[in-house]
């Protein structure tokens, strides 16, 4: 049976399929973990420890050495994405109720959901798109996008926007596994190769544990809103990213569109933030469902939009080149 190949046909499948299975488990048998106990309970409830190992391995996979072009492109996209998420957070905090929208079509929408969906790019999706439509340097720009993985950037955005306050040691605790992994991976290439193999392997495990915090009725209630959130992520982050790529990154805007997705790891952010700030716990399930839907939507639409944009840009460049030759 080609189970893995079938799952990978779904955008973000290795994250979303286990997430859905976990949600099924939680919806129809919420006490399964406590009933079985031991290792089974650990797999069902171990979101935070599994993610801690994943962040460590993610840090170990990042190479410190990169060309100036790669760093400029990557830095431009990362900073722009985070800046846009901060602006959205600042505006949303003045419009959306403190505990999120509780009634009507927008029920479940919160500042936490918006920031989590917008501040993190799907680095793997970006790299695969740019390998097809961009240069090697542009494809390699995902090197700094891994720094967005995890709750740190979301914590910084929520903290600096005045939406939440975090003690300094909480910030350190959130980033320490990543930094230790980063240090070890760059001190020893063999360790980098060893730990980086676990990055993809651990995704289904933390996705399943994360799914066990979600009730499927919440997904049903936030389905259409999640689709709209995914479209909003592409529009709201995509336009500034295109402009930044052209003006600062030295590109033609293609990399900007390719970076306008939501990362699969962003699905875990609401739960992790809620662990640190209990005030966010009531919003976490709905925010997780919204972000999960946004991940699917952006994973489908971003490659299509990037393809259309790239073809138009290249056609325009070819036309200008022909006109220049004629003259």
Curated annotation (Swiss-Prot):
Main localization of the protein described in the UniProt heading: membrane
Transmembrane segments annotated in the record for this chain: 10-30, 42-62, 73-93, 95-115, 139-159, 163-183, 199-219, 224-244, 254-274, 289-309
Its job: Catalyzes the proton-dependent uptake of 2-keto-3-deoxygluconate (KDG) into the cell.
Keywords tagged on the record: Cell inner membrane, Cell membrane, Membrane, Sugar transport, Symport, Transmembrane, Transmembrane helix, Transport
Protein family (similarity comment): Belongs to the KdgT transporter family.
Catalytic activity: 2-dehydro-3-deoxy-D-gluconate(in) + H(+)(in) = 2-dehydro-3-deoxy-D-gluconate(out) + H(+)(out)
An annotated Gene Ontology molecular function: 2-keto-3-deoxygluconate:proton symporter activity
Pfam families, alphabetized: KdgT
Native source species: Escherichia coli O139:H28 (strain E24377A / ETEC)
GO cellular component labels: plasma membrane
Protein's membrane topology: Multi-pass membrane protein
Annotated compartments: Cell inner membrane
Stated name of the protein: 2-keto-3-deoxygluconate permease
InterPro entries in the record: 2keto-3dGluconate_permease (IPR004684), 2keto-3dGluconate_permease_sub (IPR018395)
